[in-house]
Amino acid sequence: MTRNIIIATATAALIGLGALPASANSVWLDQHGYSNQAGGSQSGFNNVIGVLQNGVFNGAISQQNGHGNTAATGQQGYNNYSNTYQQGNYNQGGVGQFGSNHTTILTQDGNGNIAAGVQVGNGCSANIDQAGSGNVAAFVQTCP
């Protein structure tokens, strides 16, 4: 009897652990330098946040509410800031900032929106706001 209980408990635990990654959210961070900051929140499932910061005094925040959203931020240099907010399902947002003193705010409210952009140089600013579904936006800025 005890043997059957142990086997049943072990089987239930393995099934539960096997089902977890299929609906789990994920976050990866890779920060170099010093005084870089990253934060985020995820509500739903299959959401992904990725942040790579190389330099100093960079900041990134990502917030996701829904399912299947992806937010990626790459920053190289110093004093760059990125904020990505995703509300809905299957939104994809990516920001690359190379240089210094850049700011990007990316907001996606809906389903299946795609936005990506790059800022190069010093002191660029971008504010992307997508409402509804199926929107696509891309930007490239070079600032002195």
Where are these predicted regions, by residue range?
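Positively charged n-region of N-terminal signal peptides that target proteins for export
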Residues: 1-7
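Low-complexity repeat regions of mature extracellularly deployed or surface/particle-associated proteins
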Residues: 24-144
